């Protein structure tokens, strides 16, 4: 006799109970738990048991009694995959291996009825590109009760350590962001789908009960998982001696009042858009940062990125034969930064830009190498005449990297610290 498996936490126990007979039946190809008698006993509540020689339930009844109600979107993912692949994907149940030894999982073949259901729902190969691409690489599920940007940026930074492998498709990875997951039903659906795809689950859930339920559910279905923020939150709580609130950023009462930081960012973005490309040079004195460089060195996108961080930014194009605004030399020179770039890279960018605008080589010398070099030499002469302007080479740099260099220099000049840093008070 195989004993009952240890029950999960309260939210998961509620899911594991069989629904009422009137409950809705799921489509035949829905990836429900194994329907073997041993696994059926494993999900019963403590104290219940069945004899080993009891007849196994019919597969349709087992799926109906054990499977929870799932969202139509995730359900359709499951059915479309089964129809395309010709079999139902096996579910990784490492946590239940001891309960499923005596009976192998049931693998269903697609039936005409399945195709009929798919036809009714209008499913085809274009239902979900993420589903189709999942077979091309390992899946990473990012689950958050907020926007998920924090976890997504953390994952992107971590994936940067595997660039060589990712570039040659030796270890292809697909990331899938699930944001605003704030109830248990949706959380369970996502984890079940992760189990089907053999995905890694990375989550940022402020509510401790949701985070604990995620860990237990992932253990139950054999899904590898990691809490991205919990170690940091616990370290800060220990350092300042205050317990965390457990309230996600998206919680209504938390967003009831707009912070001063929010209005500062809105004001910075509005200012930056109005000062783009040297417009209104009389307002340069109001800017926190002023960028100068030849065309296509990334002044505008860099300005917008910095504005989203709350900095008012103006940018000035350096053009041969056009004098720079007088106000540029009258403001505090600590906030002026020059941008330069490799001429070959700049030529390639300009060629693409010219093609987009419908220019060709006969109409403009904008993308000619000689002209590109002359402009860069002219800009360098201006930078030499103004040695207090830090000149940053943007070749091969992401906007975030260039912004980090600028902010590091800016804050170091303001604070006169022994070590360069970017400081912010909360």
Swiss-Prot record:
Task: State if Transferase is listed as a keyword.
Answer: yes
Q: How is activity regulated here?
A: Regulated by light/dark exposure.
Pathway annotation from the record: Photosynthesis; C4 acid pathway
Alphabetically ordered keywords of this record: Chloroplast, Kinase, Nucleotide-binding, Plastid, Serine/threonine-protein kinase, Transferase, Transit peptide
Annotated compartments: Plastid, Chloroplast stroma
- Give an example GO molecular function: phosphotransferase activity, phosphate group as acceptor
The parts of the chain that form a coiled coil are none
Looking at the keywords, is Transit peptide present? yes
Question: What are its cofactors?
Answer: Mg(2+)
Recorded GO CC terms: chloroplast stroma
EC code = 2.7.11.32, 2.7.4.27
Principal localisation: plastid
User: Which parts of the sequence bind ADP?
Assistant: 153-160
pH-dependence of activity, as noted: Optimum pH is 7.8-8.4 for both catalytic activities.
| Expression (tissue specificity) | Leaf mesophyll-cells.
Name the chemical reaction catalysed here: N(tele)-phospho-L-histidyl/L-threonyl-[pyruvate, phosphate dikinase] + ADP = N(tele)-phospho-L-histidyl/O-phospho-L-threonyl-[pyruvate, phosphate dikinase] + AMP + H(+); N(tele)-phospho-L-histidyl/O-phospho-L-threonyl-[pyruvate, phosphate dikinase] + phosphate + H(+) = N(tele)-phospho-L-histidyl/L-threonyl-[pyruvate, phosphate dikinase] + diphosphate
Chain intervals with Low complexity compositional bias: 94-119
**What quaternary arrangement does the UniProt entry report?**
homodimer at pH 7.5 and homotetramer at pH 8.3.
Q: Output the NCBIfam families linked to this UniProt entry.
A: PRK05339.1
What is the documented function of this protein? Bifunctional serine/threonine kinase and phosphorylase involved in the dark/light-mediated regulation of PPDK by catalyzing its phosphorylation/dephosphorylation. Dark/light-induced changes in stromal concentrations of the competing ADP and Pi substrates govern the direction of the reaction. In the dark, phosphorylates the catalytic intermediate of PPDK (PPDK-HisP), inactivating it. Light exposure induces the phosphorolysis reaction that reactivates PPDK.
- What protein does this entry describe? Pyruvate, phosphate dikinase regulatory protein, chloroplastic
State the species of origin.
Zea mays (Maize)
Lineage summary: Eukaryota, Viridiplantae, Streptophyta, Embryophyta, Tracheophyta
């Amino acid at each position: 006799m195989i004993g009952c498996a240890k029950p999960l936490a309260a939210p998961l126990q509620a899911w594991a109970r069989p629904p009422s007979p009137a409950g809705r039946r799921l489509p035949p190809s829905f990836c429900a738990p194994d329907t073997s008698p041993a696994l059926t006993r494993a999900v019963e509540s403590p104290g219940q048991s069945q004899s080993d020689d009891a007849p196994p339930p019919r597969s349709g009844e087992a799926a109906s009694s054990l499977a929870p109600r799932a969202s139509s979107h995730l359900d359709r993912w499951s059915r479309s995959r089964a129809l395309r692949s010709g079999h139902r994907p096996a579910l990784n149940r490492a946590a239940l291996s001891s309960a499923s030894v005596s009976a192998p999982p049931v693998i269903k073949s697609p039936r005409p009825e399945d195709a009929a259901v798919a036809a009714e729902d209008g499913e085809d190969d274009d239902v979900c590109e993420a589903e189709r691409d999942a077979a091309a690489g390992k899946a990473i599920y990012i689950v958050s009760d907020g926007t998920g940007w924090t976890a997504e940026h953390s994952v992107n930074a971590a994936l940067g350590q595997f660039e060589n492998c990712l570039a040659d498709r030796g270890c292809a990875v697909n990331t899938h962001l699930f944001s605003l997951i704030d109830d248990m039903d949706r959380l369970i659906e996502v984890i079940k789908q992760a189990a089907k795809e053999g995905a890694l689950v990375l989550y940022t859930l402020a509510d401790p009960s949701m985070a604990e339920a995620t860990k237990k559910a992932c253990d139950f279905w054999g899904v590898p998982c990691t809490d991205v923020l919990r170690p940091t939150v616990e370290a800060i709580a220990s350092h300042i001696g205050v317990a965390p609130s457990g309230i996600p950023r998206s919680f209504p009462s938390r967003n009831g009042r707009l912070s001063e930081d929010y209005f500062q960012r809105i004001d910075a973005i509005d200012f930056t858009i109005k000062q783009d490309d040297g417009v209104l040079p009389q307002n340069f004195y109001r800017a926190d940062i002023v960028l100068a460089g030849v065309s296509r060195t990334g002044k505008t996108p860099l300005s917008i990125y910095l504005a989203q961080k709350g900095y008012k930014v103006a940018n000035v194009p350096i053009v041969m034969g056009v004098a720079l605004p007088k106000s540029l030399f009258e403001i505090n020179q600590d906030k002026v930064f020059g941008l330069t770039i490799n001429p070959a890279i700049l030529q390639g960018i300009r060629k693409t830009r010219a093609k987009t605008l419908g220019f060709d080589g006969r109409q403009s010398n904008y993308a000619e190498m000689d002209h590109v070099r002359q402009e860069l030499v002219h800009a360098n002469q201006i930078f030499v005449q103004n040695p207090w302007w830090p000149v940053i080479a943007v070749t091969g740099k992401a906007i975030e990297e260039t912004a980090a260099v600028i902010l590091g220099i800016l804050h170091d000049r303001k604070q006169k610290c022994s070590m360069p840093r970017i400081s912010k008070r909360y």
